[in-house]
Amino acid sequence: METDSMECVSSTGNEIHQNGNGHQSYQFSSTKTHGGAAAAAVVTNIVGPTATAPATSVYELLECPVCTYSMYPPIHQCHNGHTLCSTCKVRVHNRCPTCRQELGDIRCLALEKVAESLELPCKFYNLGCPEIFPYYSKLKHESLCNFRPYSCPYAGSECGIVGDIPFLVAHLRDDHKVDMHAGSTFNHRYVKSNPREVENATWMLTVFHCFGQYFCLHFEAFQLGMGPVYMAFLRFMGDEEDARSYSYSLEVGGSGRKLTWEGTPRSIRDSHRKVRDSNDGLIIQRNMALFFSGGDRKELKLRVTGKIWKEQHSPDSGLSIPNLSSS
């Protein structure tokens, strides 16, 4: 991590020096039950839309006792009828984790057929998802479900925290010590004493609250090809569909010149690396950055300003009219 100064300047002129912070790892508690041996049973019940949880006994039968995830074909079993998923069969070196007998290559076709007859709620039903799916279609939906938790947008580490937006905002503030601002305009300054040395991890993050939403402003320096570049971009703390309701602009300049960028913030559903690697933001090459810095061009002094606004659709003209008021 670079040790040079990275400063966040709020609209009111207060300066905050932000460096790399340590982080803590957390996990949500789970109340999952571990499945046992497969039972010889015919299951005909379908979980209806008013149910609050899957049929427990059936769900347990389809839960791998090793990884506790739902099992999908091929489902394996030992001679005593204990089942596990194909991934865990390799992990346990072909030995049943329940009775220690050799697994062989026996498939539990009966349990696979039972699964075909089931309809189950999305696993995010307790977060508000009302959808019911055939067992083998459920996994695909859950990977894209709008009610699934968001991943922590902090870019300086592999943080595994997930949760809803209010939880993540508190997590960023309290655990990652991220700078928080209210308002839709920003004024940031990035200062580096030796602009010829750049680590890929040199970056800063600020969270803005406006229009009742939260936005993450990223500013980073990283190596691209033979030289360093500096990039700024905005991410929306919510889904992509809602992100399209907002726009933002970024501007960097100096010595009578300026470079501007305007775009739509990306949802934090897209990973930080995905956004960065797509070049979807304001990108400043080192020579241009030094030109904007002025002076003898031996020290980098970049000031990035910008604003966020909400697009308002005009029913008469069909055009989008920017709303610059953050209240």
From Swiss-Prot:
Induction section of the entry: Induced by drought stress, salt stress, osmotic shock and abscisic acid (ABA).
Stretches the record annotates as Disordered: 1-27
Main location: other
Alphabetized UniProt keyword annotations: Cytoplasmic vesicle, Endosome, Metal-binding, Transferase, Ubl conjugation pathway, Zinc, Zinc-finger
Zinc fingers (RING-type), renumbered ranges: 64-100
Residues noted as binding Zn(2+) 2 in the record, renumbered to the chain: 152, 159, 171, 176
Top enzyme category: transferase
Single GO MF descriptor: ubiquitin protein ligase activity
Reaction catalyzed: S-ubiquitinyl-[E2 ubiquitin-conjugating enzyme]-L-cysteine + [acceptor protein]-L-lysine = [E2 ubiquitin-conjugating enzyme]-L-cysteine + N(6)-ubiquitinyl-[acceptor protein]-L-lysine
UniProt subcellular location: Endosome, Multivesicular body; Cytoplasmic vesicle, Autophagosome
Consequence when changing residue 82 to Y: Loss of ubiquitin ligase activity
EC number of this enzyme: 2.3.2.27
Biased composition (Polar residues): 8-27
Pathway: Protein modification; protein ubiquitination
Start and end residues of each stretch annotated as SBD: 114-307
GO biological process terms on file: protein ubiquitination; ubiquitin-dependent protein catabolic process
Similarity annotation: Belongs to the SINA (Seven in absentia) family.
Chain's role: E3 ubiquitin-protein ligase that mediates ubiquitination and subsequent proteasomal degradation of target proteins. E3 ubiquitin ligases accept ubiquitin from an E2 ubiquitin-conjugating enzyme in the form of a thioester and then directly transfers the ubiquitin to targeted substrates. It probably triggers the ubiquitin-mediated degradation of different substrates. Modulates directly the ubiquitination and proteasomal-dependent degradation of FREE1, a component of the ESCRT-I complex.
Subunit structure of this chain's protein: Interacts with SINAT6. Interacts with WAV3. Interacts with FREE1. Interacts with ELC/VPS23A.
The protein's name in its UniProt record: E3 ubiquitin-protein ligase SINAT4
Origin species: Arabidopsis thaliana (Mouse-ear cress)
